[in-house]
Amino acid sequence: MKKIIIFSLLQLTAFSQSKYADSFLRIGTSTRSISVGQAVVALPAHPQAYLYNPAGIALSDHSAFSFLAVNQFSLADYYSFSVSTPLGAKTVFGFHGIGLLIDHILERPDIHGISDLEARRDTIQTLVAEGFSSFSNRETAWTFTLSRKFQYTVDLGWQADQILLQCPVGINIRYIQKSLHKLNGRGIGIDAGGLIQIPLKDVYSFSNAGLFTLGGTVTNLVGTKIFWSSEKEDLIPMRFIRGASYKQDLIIIPVTANFLYQSTQGVDEKEQFGCELVVKDRIFLRAGSDEAGLHGGVGFQFMFFQKKIDLGYSFLSHDLGKAHRFDFTVRLN
């Protein structure tokens, strides 16, 4: 039954003219982003959030490699990796990959055109005896990200000091490949995004005020077309994603809280929420909500062979089953 459900979803994904053509890109690229409901358009310095905002990696000051592998509901294999590295003091480059594979989908011939009951019976017996042939669905995306950090000073008038704003911008160039049964499809998409990071402690002269960030991204600029070998075209529509985050150090205990919000405008308008608690920069507790339901997760950071390692876990209970996801990130310098 699950195979039938998955195949139905695949048909929507491969042959829809609108919002399903890029659904595999929205599974998630890290346990951190998945755990907070993927409300990461305004989350800075998280390279794996590139699909929602390519500008965020400009605020990362180190090279990193991350990898996520998932057996989705015991039916599909999904992976994601990300490599990012600074190119000087203000520019960061990233290369990322995503892949979804659903294998051994049984091909069931259409026998509705056989009206004779005996002929239909014989056909079914022959098919069962010989076995059904199968095919696979593969969807991959390769993305290049380039992000640059800009700084501006703002004089609010009532302050003795000017306010320093961090304003990175970024762009994604993505190559998409699809393979379903005997069909192949390809397309190229472009995203552009930006962040504005505001230190509220400088705005209000209150030392414990947090860091407020606004983010916005236009994905699939002017639409991304998937060209199929059948000469059919699918269109991934342009979407505008906007959101905000607020990072606050708690006074009494050594905990930092991140509150995240994101909304998407386009053919599938939606809202996403997330929260992350960071305990002593070592333990991460995460929760979030999106159209798939409620998510939860944890993360741990430690040193191994003089490299900083992040291990993450996220969990989702879905109608198709429970999804457990694990990933790791290695900071290379």
Where are each of the predicted segments found?
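Sec-dependent N-terminal signal peptides
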Residues: K3-T13
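Subset of outer-membrane beta-barrel
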Residues: Q17-N333
